[in-house]
Regions:
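Short runs within selected transmembrane alpha-helices of multi-pass transporters and secretion channels
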Residues: 61, 65, 130-149, 156-167, ...
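Helix-terminus/linker motif at the lipid-water interface of multi-pass membrane proteins
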Residues: 19, 23-41, 110-117, 173-184
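Short alpha-helical transmembrane segments in multi-pass integral membrane proteins
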Residues: 1-11, 68-133, 181-207
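Alpha-helical transmembrane segments of multi-pass membrane transporters
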Residues: 102, 155-184, 198-199, 203-204
């Protein structure tokens, strides 16, 4: 029988990992609100589009997580690796396809949602860089599924902290041009988010 403390020690890192992706959007909003209303609106639209695509990968990883947890519970540890590898490869292919889809049709979709020409242009500038994050965030959710499935969820806490801190520092640096980096505005926010996702993936893959 598990105690409440044991259950909480496993579950709270999962909660933090769920919040991590949203923290990126909140951080972008906080910094871009100091740039202009156009940048703020564009990051909101671009961030929402990104999250909608991201949930496709998240849904697949949840299914993989169930399989991994079952293999782990059955003590079939050797079967966990193949599930993980297949999941990563599948999500990388999915990331490539959705990257291409967004490049080809993202502008048309935004035209239907955004009436302001200036916000549309800023949104597309944001997305042109932000969608490179697909390749990192899609693999990220597969590692999340692995660590939850084998109940090593404390790794997710470190991952969430690394992602949040990296994004805050790089947002400040790239949006406003600090630490010797160029002032890039909304494009800087997108690049910072992608690098933050890459940094968190590096932490997961090296644990």
């Amino acid at each position: 029988m598990y105690t409440n403390k044991q259950i909480w020690s496993v579950s709270y890192p999962i909660l933090l990992s769920l919040l991590a992706q949203n923290v990126i959007n909140v951080t972008d909003t906080a910094f871009l609100g100091r740039v202009s209303e156009i940048a703020l609106g564009a990051s909101a639209m671009g961030g929402l589009f990104y999250i909608c695509i991201f949930t496709i990968a998240f849904g697949f990883s949840t299914g993989s997580q169930i399989v991994i947890a079952r293999r782990n519970g059955e003590a079939r540890y050797g079967d966990v690796g193949p599930v993980m590898i297949q999941g990563v490869l599948f999500l990388l292919v999915m990331a490539l396809l959705l990257f291409g889809f967004t490049k080809a049709f993202g502008g048309n979709i935004m035209r239907l949602l955004v009436s302001s020409e200036s916000i549309y242009d800023a949104t597309m500038e944001f997305l042109d860089w932000r969608i490179f994050g697909f390749f990192f965030s899609f693999v990220n959710v597969m590692f999340r599924a692995l660590y939850i499935g084998i109940t090593r969820t404390k790794v997710l806490t470190i991952n969430a902290v690394v992602m949040a801190l990296t994004n805050v520092v790089l947002d400040y640096a790239l949006i406003f041009g600090h630490f010797g980096l160029p002032e890039m505005g909304i494009k800087g926010a997108a690049i910072a988010s992608v690098i933050a996702e890459a940094a968190s993936l590096d932490r997961k893959s090296t644990r």
